[in-house]
């Protein structure tokens, strides 16, 4: 296994301490936030329907697992997870049971958006996961799912919505989030020790 510590981008002292042990920069991540007051216009795509799912339904969780594994399979650090491990993660997280949405294209599931209750005490929504199957990247489905997640957070009465992003994500997620109105609030970097 590989140790990959995360460090706040502003914490040069801690970064230098890790560097003394041979650790180097690997990736940068942003926490992004957007103030929300009115629901965005959800992009309509011919043949695409977005609807909430029932996370207590084992078949829908299995489908979500399949979508996740496909959507993130080319992402940095991706490691396949077996369905049972996925079910455990779903059961043990702060998932808002009404805040998981699937996109269906011509009746076939092609993407998902998952909102969390993690920051409810701060009156802030959190979009924890957003994924679109590889063959549907660049079709606008990700933007429609993101807008659905934002609208859901507005319906909960939140003042803002937050998400995290790998700035090196090859899918163009950072560009999408900026386009929709998210701004970087903080940044952290992931370090690693190169093999000798």
Show which residues each predicted segment covers.
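Residue-level recognition of the GNAT/N-acetyltransferase active site
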Residues: 8, 133, 137, 166
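Short glycine/proline-centered loop/turn elements that form peptide/ligand docking sites
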Residues: 146, 169-173, 190-195
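Conserved GNAT acetyl-CoA-binding A-motif
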Residues: 1-9, 153-165
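Conserved acetyl-CoA-binding loop-helix of GNAT-fold acetyltransferases
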Residues: 132, 138-155, 174-179
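Acyl-donor-binding surface of acyltransferase catalytic domains
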Residues: 1-49, 187-193
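A short beta-loop-alpha structural element at the N-terminal edge
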Residues: 49-66
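A conserved beta-strand-loop-helix scaffold within acyl/acetyltransferase catalytic domains
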Residues: 75-132
């Amino acid at each position: 296994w590989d140790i990959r510590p995360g460090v706040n981008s502003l914490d040069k002292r801690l970064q230098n301490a890790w560097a003394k042990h041979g650790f180097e920069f690997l990736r940068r991540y942003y926490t992004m936030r957007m103030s929300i007051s009115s629901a965005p216009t959800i992009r309509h795509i011919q043949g695409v329907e977005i609807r909430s799912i029932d996370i207590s339904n084992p078949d829908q969780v299995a489908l979500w697992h399949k979508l996740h594994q496909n959507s993130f399979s080319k992402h940095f650090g991706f490691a396949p997870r077996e369905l049972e491990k996925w079910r455990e993660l779903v059961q043990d997280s702060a998932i808002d049971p009404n805040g998981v949405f699937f996109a269906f294209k011509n009746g076939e599931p092609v993407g998902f958006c998952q909102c969390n209750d993690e920051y409810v005490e701060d009156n802030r929504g959190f979009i924890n996961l957003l994924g679109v199957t590889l063959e549907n990247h660049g079709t606008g489905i990700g933007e429609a799912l993101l807008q659905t997640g934002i609208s859901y957070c507005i319906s909960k009465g939140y003042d803002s919505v937050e998400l995290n992003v790998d700035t090196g994500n090859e899918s163009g997620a950072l560009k999408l989030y900026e386009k929709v109105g998210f701004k970087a609030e903080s940044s952290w970097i992931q370090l690693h020790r190169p093999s000798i």
